[in-house]
């Protein structure tokens, strides 16, 4: 089976390390991104779409860009500060 498109995710963890994940399936890419967001593990996530057929073969197009994401510890501190009566 010949794939028509590819997604490449580039993300930076809170310790400053960059990682990548590539897939040919959009749903898998979105699922992976959602898992990273829900775990508060990344400070930055970018997703690039590549066409593998047609006029724009191999040219990346940024389809998702999130910067300045907070860590789980920061999220907990923010909730405790805003709603101290909850704890």
Where are these regions (language model features)?
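A short, exposed loop/beta-hairpin motif centered on an aromatic-Gly-Thr core
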Residues: 15-31
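Short, mixed-charge low-complexity intrinsically disordered segments
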Residues: 37-87
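Surface-exposed alpha-helical segments enriched in charged/polar residues
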Residues: 30-38
């Amino acid at each position: 089976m010949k794939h028509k498109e590819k997604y490449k995710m580039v993300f930076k963890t809170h310790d400053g390390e960059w990682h990548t994940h590539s897939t040919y399936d959009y749903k898998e890419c979105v699922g992976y991104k959602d898992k990273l967001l829900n775990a508060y593990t990344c400070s930055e996530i970018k997703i690039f779409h590549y066409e593998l057929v047609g006029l724009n073969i191999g040219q990346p197009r940024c389809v998702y860009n999130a910067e300045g994401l907070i860590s789980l510890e920061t999220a907990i501190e923010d909730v405790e500060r805003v709603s101290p009566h909850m704890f």
